[in-house]
Amino acid sequence: MAEPEKKRDQPFSQEKDEEKDLYLVHDEHESPLPLTVTSRVLYMLGDIASGPAYRFTQWLDLVRKRSATYGSSGFPHRLHRIDDMVTSAGERNTDPKSPPSRQSSEISLWERLGKASTVDIDSSCFSWNMLSSLHHTEHSSSTDHSEEDQSKPLEVTVNSGGVVFFALFNSSSSEDASRKEEAAVIKFASSRMATQSERLGYEFSKWLGVQIPQARVIHSCNPEWTLIKEATEKAQAKATSEGDEVGEMTCSELLEALELSRCLLLMSYVHGCPMLESMSSFETEEKAERAAAALGRILVLDLVIRNEDRLPCRQLRWRGNPANLLLTDRIVSSAKHHECSFDEAFDSAIKRYHPKDYRSIQRERRASSVDSRSRLSISDQMLVSQASDFSDITESPRSYDTGLMSPMSDRSVAADFHLVAIDSGVPRRPPAGKRASDQEIYPRLVELLLNSSQYSSNLLHEITEGSLGYPQAEDGEETSNVRSVVTPVVREFRNGFRAGLRDLQEFHIFLVTLHQKLDVLLRAFFSMMDKTMCADFDREDFAVPESPSHTHGHEVNHYPSPSKDRVPSDNSSDHSESDMQKSVPRTPNSENKEDGSSPKSRESWHGRSGKGGESLSSQRLAAKLRDFHKFAKVDAESNKELDQWNETLRNEVMKLCQENGFNTGFFEGSDNNSCTDAYELKVRLEHILERISLISKAANTEKPSMIQENLFIGGGLAARSIYTLQHLGITHVLCLCANEIGQSDTQYPDLFEYQNFSITDDEDSNIESIFQEALDFIKHGEETGGKILVHCFEGRSRSATVVLAYLMLQKKLTLLEAWSKLRKVHRRAQPNDGFARILINLDKKCHGKVSMEWRQRKPTMKVCPVCGKNAGLSSSSLKLHLQKSHRKLSSGSVDSAMNMEIQKALEALKLSTGRGSSASSNSFQSHPG
């Protein structure tokens, strides 16, 4: 402790000299020892700002030491709950342990930030000349915090890490005299890629309807970078003249960060506090429902980008960070009626799918209200849980409401209630162990969240740390009071999750297209590199294997080298499957078909996996990409080739993104980095598509309908939803469509006991022949204490027929009673005409009379009463036939002939109703006698 005390006594000038020496001592050829594998790859790509990553790390250590000496730039101790916030400093509780000067400084800044309005960083009126002061949080280099340290503000170092500065500007607007200042946030990450990845994460947030602050990346090559330096120097001079030593130090640190970094992230300031720290987040049921709906969308976002630093979830092994989900009572975007992130995502979707309607929608809609009905894609029914259980629909009446509003629209979130997600960086490549874990956890979580209210409630309880939802009772009992309060909240949570899945499906195809575009261009680029550097590198080591996007059935364009002198050859080699993939067991939702966006088919593009998820081939490509950049500096022809490829990659990818209204955050800096940006973006997209594939497959699920406590009915989707079956306790599966494609591949004899029958859904099929054997299987399941699922392909005809036969033969119900019981919980049940006749005969055999009358579904052929020929299926066809073939008949005779035909049809069907009788929605009708 003595040495740090001495350092604190050293003058600032000496510390600054030490810092300069630290940077000058660095040798370009030294290996950056502190770097991880990922950082080494980024270093080889030339990504680390102004040198190796440890420069930024060591500078950050110096900043932390200064924070220990000079305090937190006046930033208040740990964000207080909204309930504890007051408008005046006199009403606020003070910490007696804090020095008076520091305490007053913190209160002063807290008041300034609270009263400041939010800068519209995208406005043309935004100017750095209005910058008045800079502040930043305290920094902590230790992960173990004492109780005293936990009361201090935490540095925002989640995902991308780095340093966060709070910038206060003099207000340029005189609309509100009480707000003389405006606030914004400046964030420096440890690398250019980390900054761009965070901007990419915000883009995903916007497209998924998650509320976010405004954010944009500013690169050092941008003229705005110089304006920031000049404004900071002016603010530093102002702080010096006022004797503000801390303010001067903060400005100095920002200038140092500008020298070290190649880009920064500028964001709008969010007035609020962590959601879980606010007692008002869930004080009313209405607010709780709105928060739950927003959390459903945020969960989809974090599953896609694999962000484990926001929502705590033991099942997903996410540690969570409540500070990255803020509750605010102010609109996040600018006060000048700037559209919120949900509106921007909606606009992008409309521009893509209905460009002609975009202008009219813009004119007609309100600035703060968006009807999400227009945002639903045609694939809603595929992604929304296809639950046929009527009890589930009763519990969740709005689960199928196509008018579901976005959690960020004015109908679902009041003007004084917003949940804002911050720090949504997209990781480069998750470790192999986490990827393997995701492949096991994702399918189960998504499937059960869609199909089980109880599971959804438990999950909501976990991610809100007990604020919403309810834990699973140890004795399995739940009070009616708890259920009545929680059910609407859980319903909104599931609705928000479903809405996020729909939005995800909307731009999934675009992401696949973008990945394929990058894949084709980079393959050609790497082939050119291989040809250019073949004298220096092992061709076999550098050969680019066949990309999965080429073998996935998509026709892609081949891009020749931009240079006319060099035509890259297609050097492809077969790579063995990833070791990580070989070690991953087959999950129940996995299929034999390989998806072009699946990790299994893509892994060979990069070769075998190394430690930490870094593939060895990827490391070689990264190293050779770095070396090729060095080689191009001394070889004029290679330099020209590289410039042409940078331009081609940038133009092709940017064009595709602009056409679809998508901002990746990449390709906005120097043109010399386009090849590197393309490669890094592709790596991130691969793993995003991998997770989207897991989510989409799991979302294609169905909850079986419960006929009685131990008997369920469903379709093929229900039979494949094994996590749902296990959750329901199903042990036996009666399959009536074993001969159909894919059924044998989706059975799991290690988990369930199967009885397979091959019955076609035809009227002539003798389904009666399997009744006894099927009933014996069901009876066997009941006797062993199990639960049985009866399913066919669609869960409509064959399975419904067998269940009705079981209820009549085993439970002694009449056909009418069995039909009512089945239709009450499984509304799509509809035996075909042939099966219906069999059931009617069975009803008469068991009870001596028919309790229901059959009404056939298929229309009968209209036969001409004059000549006896088939005229068609409709009455209009018969009338046309009479007019053409029997012209001598008068119009009255035609009507008479029509009446004759109708009378014959009525007699054949034994119906007492007249010509104008309406059709029943049921296949069966109660017997009139």
UniProtKB/Swiss-Prot annotation:
Gene: PHS1
Subunit structure: Interacts with MPK18.
One Gene Ontology CC term in the entry: cytoplasm
S-S pairs: none
Source lineage: Eukaryota, Viridiplantae, Streptophyta, Embryophyta, Tracheophyta
Reactions mediated catalytically: O-phospho-L-seryl-[protein] + H2O = L-seryl-[protein] + phosphate; O-phospho-L-threonyl-[protein] + H2O = L-threonyl-[protein] + phosphate; O-phospho-L-tyrosyl-[protein] + H2O = L-tyrosyl-[protein] + phosphate
Name used for this protein in its record: Dual specificity protein phosphatase PHS1
Annotated motif Nuclear export signal, positions: 903-911
Tyrosine-protein phosphatase domain boundaries: 703-848
Gene disruption: observed consequences: Embryonic lethality when homozygous in the phs1-2 allele, but after several backcrossing, phs1-2 and other homozygous alleles (phs1-4 and phs1-5) are similar to the wild-type.
UniProt organism field: Arabidopsis thaliana (Mouse-ear cress)
